[in-house]
């Protein structure tokens, strides 16, 4: 009889966001007239930038003409998009990243999981707590962990607690770890990292032969000019870091799917025989074998992000969501809640009132004021007692949600 990958049986009952959807669906089925406002999952609501829509429409026309039709594209992405990314997102900030080191994909969520294909199972892996659940769950699926304990922590992972006491930035570990997941601006806490802080991680990784997985999915929301947007703004990072980015949140591509991963050609890791192996070659081989590339139409839309019109329209989108975050942060703070994030990030991290658990606060908001957020405990044991509220919604919905919460619930 065929056997399964038993590692899937180690996973907790359900991925966080499907569990939220299950509870919301049960509530709306029982209360069909309820006007539920969803500020939970970080999905965008505003239309794609006009420049992107126009570029994709033209690309569709290209597909209708034998002279401009495109079949299979390069698995790594079209050179014209990779070059625009290298120029605008990296070289313009002083980062030594060239187009060949950029791999276009259909999502950074996929890439942060798939990157494990090129690493061995004997690596010690460090994640922050709380953390984006995909980092943990994909390692469980890949057989890199033991079972979960009563708090949901998996054996074999090194958890780095982040809290208000350390400004939601993890301390550098005292022992050696091999693979390190960092996300800034942070999901879920909205915390940001300074260059000095990232330099500590780069120095640590270089000293220990570690690799940093740097998730910069929300870098476009940074408005503070002193904060780094890329790990490659830090000297030495090319020799110890892989960076993941996405068009989902800055340009609204959650439904059209386009992202990128940067693997520097100078980056190496050890083979079983002790030799150094270029990770770029392994990732290129992996993508060439398991991935057929992002559609031509979508890549043309992503390319339009870098046009003058696209840049202006993307900045309007970012400013819109950041204003939503400001409204959420200030309204909840004025109502007496402890709030964090929401300044250079689209997420507001909230301390639950009156000692409520994360899921109890979720249920209270859903059933009392018909507002959905994300329980902090879903991001890890250290997230218990916190709650994430997303700025990704319409202005009217954000204002209505804040009015409901602050006027109906006693929060202070």
Swiss-Prot record:
Source organism (scientific name): Synechocystis sp. (strain ATCC 27184 / PCC 6803 / Kazusa)
Function according to Swiss-Prot or TrEMBL: Involved in the synthesis of meso-diaminopimelate (m-DAP or DL-DAP), required for both lysine and peptidoglycan biosynthesis. Catalyzes the direct conversion of tetrahydrodipicolinate to LL-diaminopimelate.
Enzyme Commission no: 2.6.1.83
Key words, A-Z: Aminotransferase, Pyridoxal phosphate, Transferase
Membrane-spanning residues: none
SUPFAM superfamilies with a match to the protein in the record: PLP-dependent transferases
Swiss-Prot/TrEMBL catalytic activity: (2S,6S)-2,6-diaminopimelate + 2-oxoglutarate = (S)-2,3,4,5-tetrahydrodipicolinate + L-glutamate + H2O + H(+)
List of residues binding pyridoxal 5'-phosphate: 72, 108-109, 132, 187, 218, 246-248, 257, 292
CDD domains hit by this protein: AAT_like
Quaternary data: Homodimer.
Enzyme kind, highest EC tier: transferase
Gene: dapL
Family, as annotated: Belongs to the class-I pyridoxal-phosphate-dependent aminotransferase family. LL-diaminopimelate aminotransferase subfamily.
The protein's required cofactors: pyridoxal 5'-phosphate
Transferase in keyword set: yes
GO molecular function terms attached to this record: L,L-diaminopimelate aminotransferase activity; pyridoxal phosphate binding
One GO term (biological process): lysine biosynthetic process via diaminopimelate, diaminopimelate-aminotransferase pathway
Binding site for substrate: 15, 42, 109, 132, 187, 292, 388
Protein name: LL-diaminopimelate aminotransferase
């Amino acid at each position: 009889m065929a056997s399964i990958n038993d590692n899937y049986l180690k996973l907790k009952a359900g991925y966080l966001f499907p569990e939220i959807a299950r509870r919301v669906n049960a509530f709306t089925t029982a209360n069909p007239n309820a006007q539920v406002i969803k500020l939970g999952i970080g999905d965008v609501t505003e239309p794609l930038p006009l420049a992107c829509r126009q570029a994709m429409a033209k690309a569709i026309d290209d597909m209708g003409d034998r002279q401009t039709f495109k079949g299979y594209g390069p698995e790594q992405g079209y050179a014209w998009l990779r070059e625009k990314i290298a120029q605008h997102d990296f070289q313009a900030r002083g980062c030594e990243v060239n187009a060949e080191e950029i791999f276009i994909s259909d999502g950074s969520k996929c890439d942060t999981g798939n990157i494990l294909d090129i690493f061995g199972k004997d690596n010690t892996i460090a994640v922050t707590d709380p953390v984006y659940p995909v980092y943990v769950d994909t390692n469980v699926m890949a057989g890199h962990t033991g079972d979960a304990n009563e708090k949901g922590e998996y054996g074999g992972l090194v958890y780095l607690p982040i809290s208000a006491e350390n400004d939601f930035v993890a301390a550098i570990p005292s022992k050696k770890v091999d693979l390190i997941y960092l996300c800034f601006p942070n999901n879920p806490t909205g915390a940001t990292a300074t260059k000095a802080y990232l330099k500590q991680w780069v120095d640590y990784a270089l000293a220990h032969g570690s690799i940093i997985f740097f998730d910069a999915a929300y870098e476009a929301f940074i408005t503070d000019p002193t904060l780094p947007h890329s790990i490659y703004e830090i000297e030495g990072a090319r020799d110890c870091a892989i960076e993941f980015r996405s068009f989902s949140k800055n340009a609204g591509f959650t439904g059209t799917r386009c992202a990128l991963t940067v693997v520097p050609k100078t980056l190496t890791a050890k083979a079983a025989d002790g030799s150094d192996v270029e990770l770029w070659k392994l990732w290129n081989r992996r993508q060439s074998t398991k991935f057929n590339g992002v559609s031509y139409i979508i890549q043309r839309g992503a390319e339009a992000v870098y046009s003058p019109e696209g840049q202006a329209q993307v900045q309007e989108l970012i400013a819109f969501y950041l204003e939503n975050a400001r409204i959420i942060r200030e309204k909840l703070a004025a109502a007496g809640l402890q709030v964090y994030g929401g300044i250079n990030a689209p997420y507001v991290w909230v301390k639950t009132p009156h000692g409520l658990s994360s899921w109890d606060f979720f249920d209270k908001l859903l059933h009392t004021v018909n507002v959905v957020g994300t329980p902090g405990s879903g991001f890890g044991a250290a997230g218990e007692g916190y709650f994430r509220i997303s700025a990704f919604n319409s202005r009217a919905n954000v204002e209505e949600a804040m009015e409901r919460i602050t006027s109906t619930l006693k929060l202070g």
